[in-house]
Every structure is written in structure tokens, then in C-alpha cells.
Amino acid sequence: MQDDLLMDKSKTQPQPQQQQRQQQQPQPESSVSEAPSTPLSSETPKPEENSAVPALSPAAAPPAPNGPDKMQMESPLLPGLSFHQPPQQPPPPQEPAAPGASLSPSFGSTWSTGTTNAVEDSFFQGITPVNGTMLFQNFPHHVNPVFGGTFSPQIGLAQTQHHQQPPPPAPAPQPAQPAQPPQAQPPQQRRSPASPSQAPYAQRSAAAAYGHQPIMTSKPSSSSAVAAAAAAAAASSASSSWNTHQSVNAAWSAPSNPWGGLQAGRDPRRAVGVGVGVGVGVPSPLNPISPLKKPFSSNVIAPPKFPRAAPLTSKSWMEDNAFRTDNGNNLLPFQDRSRPYDTFNLHSLENSLMDMIRTDHEPLKGKHYPPSGPPMSFADIMWRNHFAGRMGINFHHPGTDNIMALNNAFLDDSHGDQALSSGLSSPTRCQNGERVERYSRKVFVGGLPPDIDEDEITASFRRFGPLVVDWPHKAESKSYFPPKGYAFLLFQEESSVQALIDACLEEDGKLYLCVSSPTIKDKPVQIRPWNLSDSDFVMDGSQPLDPRKTIFVGGVPRPLRAVELAMIMDRLYGGVCYAGIDTDPELKYPKGAGRVAFSNQQSYIAAISARFVQLQHNDIDKRVEVKPYVLDDQMCDECQGTRCGGKFAPFFCANVTCLQYYCEYCWASIHSRAGREFHKPLVKEGGDRPRHVPFRWS
């Protein structure tokens, strides 16, 4: 078949006679099988230029003819390794190739010399195409499948045009025109068996973009039969070639194909071919003209996207618990937990906030309250409205913090894990333009030099803001020196405490600052601020808080936090659902007492029966007193106010046989019985009377 093309170059035969002659001519089986995989160039290079082709692509090289003119052939697997003659050499005269001889460029149009130059020269803006082709902005130019197209627009494009064009008369012999090499006609393409139908605009866009004139035949049905036979014979050859894609892994990263081996382990959806010579079979979700438009679908089964040198590992690149749907994490909102995580897909802020609010309002187990207070449920709000003020528990937070968890989740560094973090490096939060206090304005300073006085202490800390130095029994002692080497700094502004914390050095979870005295220079002293978030801790938020199951713990060391008190009591008696540290309503510093609420009566009775508890935690080891917490606004449990005129009951019997509030009349009546005459009533003393702190809802 190739000898006929070369020996009949001087004389032109009619097109129908060429097709009839090709159908009658017997072809060896090897020639037919090599036909689809050996596309012919539209130009005939010189003999010395074709010498490198068999060495680099031996599988695609046909038997070399004996004539001086040889047809250039390229490998179907490596479109990037196309060997075409330099553009400076004038090509010899061409003739229209027969449909049986002009084979399809298979997966890309870069196999022909003219089309390859069009890709290389016209893909980048500002460079004039060498071959005279022109790119239209309004038509997608599917030059190579990696630039946004699929295989269907290229395979069988010319053959589709043959069926739509009426058969013209036999072409007359035309003289060769060596002066017009840019108008070289590409080889005729034949339809791929894998793509029986073509997109309606594929041929229009390709023809308009490149201005190539299809090679028309007088017998399209005959050419279709030849094309179908050749394509069917090439099925086994093409499939065997793609099955050996692992062996040509190095060829994808050849100099003519610098982008082929890039990101082999990534998601093929992210692989966007941006370089010339990218390997065939790498799809791209972006259109070269309009990146927002995805390419049209195709029936072609693409070859493997990227050859991998090693098998993929089964472990995901994200943690498995990131996609849980039990609301146990805040990484992805509920709407996005069913699909893989995509860093380029920014979900809406509204969904994120609603998801965090829903997660924060779920029952808290072993979590701290944020510094402005816990995210309150409806039952929690009801309990605090009725009992929190009577119990003297100070909640230093506006109510809006409980409704919107934005500040708590984004600005609170220790939210959700405050039991393990000190929260000393957290900045002061702001809400609605108003600063929200995070620390008490009263700061403990320990390890002072023995010869330092009040004025020297004030001078050492005045740079952080206005303050007053105080220590226990200062007014009675009339001394200018702290008696036990420690003092309290009372700052006027909470921001001064934050500045002091920022200036300290942290070691083993403790803060230190160097202070000088007349005899000691730069002595490290311990700075111990009180974080307001350490005042309350919820062990089990699913249980209601019952003030009649709450105990009072006296003599609590001031460094002890609510979480530590809850852990100690839960370890001893179990059933702890809440623990709180009593703080001063003005300075919000611990007063040395705490309260623990239990979820069951057994734990409550066990705690009050012990009377004393040994608190041990880190450096703390102290024996404290435990007794029932007495409320002063309870009605008599015996008469319900009928005998006392509706007054509150002043007495509470802490004996396990009673555990009730009594008015004076009922107390005398009940405890006059045998076995109860030794019960002692508990009375709310004036000094221990709780203060009613109204909620700050705004």
C-alpha cells in the first residue's frame, strides 16, 4: 500500500479508482494491524531524518521502503515524542492521501507536523502561529485531550465530515505548491470504534479554529468500510499497548513532556494540563477558553490517568474521625461530612456557625465552661434563675455568649480543653465592641524578697497599670512589708493583668517575673492570676442541678480550680455533675470556698456524712470541711408554710434521716420524737449569706 503511494507520485489517479484499487489489493496481516497505530505524516521527510524513529519507537515503525522518500511515523503511546522535520526545510510537494493510507492520529492531533506546530505556537497568547492557523476565542479548540477536551472530538473528526459533505467529483491533478507550506493539509482521520457518535459542535469548532480542509472522497461508504476494518484490526494492538503503560513511565517525563510525571499521586480531578506535550489520557476539568465550563461527556474509555510506579496505600490522607457524622467533631459541617474534604471548597459561614452551635449545645461531659460562662441549655437557664443567685454562684458572662458560640469557639483558645491548658496566653476577648474580662483584677504574687516594702512592690508593677498592693491583715499589722513573702496586686483595669501575663516567663506551667529589692536584684517571683473560666466546671451537663444535692466545701485552697475540685469529689464519691469556686463579686477572685452538685442522693449523702475531705492535687494537700449547702429561701417541707404564715424555713436538718427544711414550729414538733432529739439544725449565717447577683443579659 505504501509502495503504491510513492511510485505513483508523478501521475494522479481518480479518487474512485484509488479506493477500488486499495480494496482489491491483498494486504499482509501485519500491515493491517499496524495501520491504526502508525499514523503517517502529511509530509515526507528526508532519509536521514527518519533514522531515529525506529530507535525510539520500534513498535510503531513499519518496514522501511526501498525508495529514497520515507514516510514519517510516530508512536501512538508517546505523542510528546513526535519527530517531525524542522520548519526551515521546505517540504516536498504533497498529494491528497488516500483514505486507506491516511490513518487517524488516534488520541491527539499532535502527531502531524502541521498540527503539532499549531499547538506549540498558538497555545500561548502573543505568539504568532507558524502554520498560519488561527484560534477563535468563541470556539473551544480541542487540539489535545489534555487541554480540556476528550478523545471523541479528535477521533473520527474527518470521517464525520465525510458523511456530511456530498461526494464531489474526482479531483483534477494540481501542481505542487512548495511556496505555501502553512496550508499543508493534515492526514485524514478515521472514526474510532469506541466513539460511534460525535458531539454536534466538535467538527465545527475544530474546522473553524484551524481552517483545515477535509480530504473528500467520492465513496464515503467505501472509506467507512476500510476504516472500520482497520480500526477493528487495531483493537488488540492498542489494548496491548495501553496495558504496558507501566513500562513507559519514564517517557512521560521526557524533555518534550515536562509535565507528564507531575503529581502522580494526586487526585486526577486536580490534574490540569498546562504544558505542551502532556501525555495523552490526562483529562482536565477546565475548558481552555472558559475555565468555568466543564468539557462535554464522551463515550470513550480513557486510558489510565497517570502511570504509578508504586501501588497506592490504603491509608487516607485525612484522619478517619474527620468525617464522622455523630457531631463529634467540628472539622466539617454536617452538610459536608458525606463528601471528601476539599480545601478549595469553602462552605458557608452560616453552616459552620449553626453546626458549632448545635455541637456546643449538646451535653457536655468533662468540659470546662468558657470564660464568659457555659453554653446554657433551657434547663440550665431555669436552674440558674431559681437557684444560682441563692447559692452565691457568680457567673461572669453575658447571656449572649450562651446563644452565639462564635466568640467561644473562635476566640477562646482553651475552649473545650481547659482542664489541660492554663489559658494564660489567651488574649482578652471582645464582643460587640466591648471587652469581656477573662482574668480577675486581683493577682497573687509569691516569693517576694523579705526586705521589699509596699512602695517597692508598687514601683515594680506600676508599668502595667495603676494598682494597689494588699496582703492579709494589712490594716491591723500596720507594716510596710508583707509578713509571709506574698502579696496581692489589685489592678484598676483587667487589661493590666493581661499585660503582666505577657511580660512573664513560663516554666512548668507557672509564671515568673523578676523583681528587685534593696539587697536582692532580679529575684524571680511567682505570678498567679485567676482565670475566670476556672470558676465553673460541668462534669455531666445532661443531669439537672438540684440545690438540695449540693454540698458546701470550706477552706478550699485558692490555686485549686473548679475542674480539679470536681475530679477529686467524683473520684471519692462519684456522681458529680457540677463544681464551682466561690469568687468575690467585685474582684472576681476566689474566696476560699466551693460548691459541688451531685446527680444522685447516694453520692450526696456519702459526701455530707464524711464531714471532712482531704484535697490532694499537685502541690495542694489540705483537709477541708464538707457540709450540706443551706438555702435561705426554702419553704418548710413539713407544713409547706401553712403553720408559719408562708415564711421561709430557717432550719435545715443535715441528718441523713431528715435532710429537710423546717420552720420553728415543725422543727420542735418533729425533733421532739425519740431518736431525733440530738439532731442539730443548720442555719444560714449572716457572714455566709449568699449575694444575689443579677444576670447581665446585655
Swiss-Prot record:
Compositional bias segments (type: Basic and acidic residues): 1-11
Function summary: Sequence-specific RNA-binding protein which acts as a translational repressor in the basal unstimulated state but, following neuronal stimulation, acts as a translational activator. In contrast to CPEB1, does not bind to the cytoplasmic polyadenylation element (CPE), a uridine-rich sequence element within the mRNA 3'-UTR, but binds to a U-rich loop within a stem-loop structure. Required for the consolidation and maintenance of hippocampal-based long term memory. In the basal state, binds to the mRNA 3'-UTR of the glutamate receptors GRIA2/GLUR2 mRNA and negatively regulates their translation.
Record note on domains: The N-terminal Gln-rich region is required for the formation of amyloid-like oligomers and for the stability of long-term potentiation and spatial memory.
CDD domains from the UniProt entry: Bbox1, RRM1_CPEB2_like, RRM2_CPEB2_like
Phosphoserine modified-residue sites: S192, S195, S290
Sites annotated Cleavage: R441, K442
Domain RRM intervals: 441-532, 549-631
Effect of F488A: Reduced RNA binding
Residues with the Asymmetric dimethylarginine modification: R308
Resulting phenotype, D470A: Does not impair RNA binding
Pfam families given in the database record: CEBP_ZZ (PF16366), RRM_7 (PF16367)
Bias-annotated ranges (Polar residues): 29-44, 103-114
UniProt PTM comment: Activated by NEURL1-mediated monoubiquitination, resulting in the growth of new dendritic spines and increased levels of GRIA1 and GRIA2. NEURL1-mediated monoubiquitination facilitates synaptic plasticity and hippocampal-dependent memory storage.
GO aspect biological process, one term: 3'-UTR-mediated mRNA destabilization
Effect caused by changing L353A: Abolishes nuclear export
Compartment annotation: Cytoplasm; Nucleus; Synapse; Cell projection, Dendrite
Organism: Homo sapiens (Human)
Biased composition (Low complexity): 13-28, 186-208
Effect of F444 to A/N: Abolishes RNA binding
Stated family: Belongs to the RRM CPEB family.
Biased composition (Pro residues): 87-96, 165-185
Superkingdom: Eukaryota
Protein name (Swiss-Prot/TrEMBL): Cytoplasmic polyadenylation element-binding protein 3
GO molecular function, one term: RNA stem-loop binding
Chief site of localization: cytoplasm
The entry's keywords: Activator, Amyloid, Cell projection, Cytoplasm, Methylation, Nucleus, Phosphoprotein, Repeat, Repressor, RNA-binding, Synapse, Translation regulation, Ubl conjugation
